[in-house]
């Protein structure tokens, strides 16, 4: 049975005070909660502080990051490597987010190379896929998702998805307040799983597929009730301890 994962992407938000307060608040809210893995991806500058805060609290919260480079060292100004992330305890690394694809011109092929390098370094890629509003309106949702997935599958084999996480995030629902219905999200998740199953039913059966896009405490239960939605990649609601914990609790309850 797939184990649900709820991950908070803090994006470009935070301060030293906020990191400590939010993580301590999460630890308190999640006390006694089992059956769900909870992860956070703070901005790179705060990963060290987040690790120290979680370690001091004896927390089970998983530490992640929002990006990684294709190199472990060298003349690559402004980048951070998988080796550096590992040294600070970050294990779950978001790649392929639509904001990286759009604002940093990251192609499917480039994201696939990041995926391979993270796996090579023993880290867990959280591979974001999803379509724009125009692509959604044109009925191209699954074609886009398949293309983004196949950039990994066709270069590394479907087995590369073992132990990784896929996050389906329709771009038109990220930070907009608009969200795909639970039924629509389930339909796409099922199609994503079926696409993977064309190469390996075993990998498809076991891979965790999160939904992302304006997930809130008010709609989380409906998403997690769907059989192919295995958690969430959460943006805005992850910046509030009570809201994020409520989403994690909904996942634990639905998948028990």
UniProtKB/Swiss-Prot annotation:
Instruction: Report the pathway entry.
Output: Carbohydrate biosynthesis; gluconeogenesis; Carbohydrate degradation; glycolysis; D-glyceraldehyde 3-phosphate from glycerone phosphate: step 1/1
Top-rank taxon of the source lineage equals Bacteria
Q: Does the UniProt entry include the keyword RNA-binding?
A: no
GO terms (BP aspect): gluconeogenesis; glyceraldehyde-3-phosphate biosynthetic process; glycerol catabolic process; glycolytic process
Entry keyword set: Cytoplasm, Gluconeogenesis, Glycolysis, Isomerase
Its main localization is cytoplasm
Cite the GO molecular-function annotations of the record: triose-phosphate isomerase activity
Q: What is its EC number?
A: 5.3.1.1
Q: Where in the cell is it found?
A: Cytoplasm
Any single Gene Ontology cellular-component annotation: cytosol
Instruction: List the catalytic residues.
Output: 97, 169
According to its UniProt record, this protein's enzyme class is isomerase
The reactions it catalyses are:
D-glyceraldehyde 3-phosphate = dihydroxyacetone phosphate
Name the Pfam families on file: TIM
Do you know which HAMAP family this protein is assigned to? TIM_B (MF_00147_B)
Give a short account of what the protein does: Involved in the gluconeogenesis. Catalyzes stereospecifically the conversion of dihydroxyacetone phosphate (DHAP) to D-glyceraldehyde-3-phosphate (G3P).
NCBIfam families recorded: tim
Q: Would you identify the family this protein belongs to, as annotated? A: Belongs to the triosephosphate isomerase family.
Q: What is this protein called?
A: Triosephosphate isomerase
Source organism of this protein record: Aliivibrio salmonicida (strain LFI1238)
**What lineage, starting at the top, does this entry show?**
Bacteria, Pseudomonadati, Pseudomonadota, Gammaproteobacteria, Vibrionales
């Amino acid at each position: 049975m797939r184990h649900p994962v709820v991950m908070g992407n803090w994006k470009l938000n935070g301060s030293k005070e906020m990191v400590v307060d939010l993580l301590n608040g999460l630890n308190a809210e999640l006390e006694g909660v089992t059956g769900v893995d909870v992860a956070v991806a703070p901005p790179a500058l705060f990963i060290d502080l987040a690790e120290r805060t979680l370690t001091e609290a004896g927390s089970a919260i998983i530490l992640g990051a929002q990006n990684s480079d294709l190199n472990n060292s060298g003349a690559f100004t402004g980048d951070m490597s998988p080796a550096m992330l590992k040294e600070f305890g970050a294990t779950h690394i978001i790649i392929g987010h639509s904001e990286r694809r759009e604002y940093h011109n990251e192609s499917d092929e480039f994201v696939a190379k990041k995926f391979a390098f993270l796996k090579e370094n023993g880290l867990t890629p959280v591979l974001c896929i999803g379509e724009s509003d125009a692509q959604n309106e044109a009925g191209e949702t699954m074609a886009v998702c398949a293309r983004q997935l196949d950039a990994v599958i066709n270069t590394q084999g479907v087995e590369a998805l073992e132990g990784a996480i896929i996050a389906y995030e329709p771009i038109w629902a990220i930070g907009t307040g608009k969200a795909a219905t639970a039924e629509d999200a389930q339909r796409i998740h099922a199609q994503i799983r079926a696409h993977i199953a064309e190469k390996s039913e075993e990998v498809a059966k076991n891979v965790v597929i999160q939904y992302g896009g304006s997930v809130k405490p008010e709609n989380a239960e409906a998403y997690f009730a769907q059989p192919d939605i295995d958690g969430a990649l959460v943006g805005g609601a992850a910046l509030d301890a009570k809201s994020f914990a409520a989403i994690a609790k909904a996942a634990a309850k639905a998948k028990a």
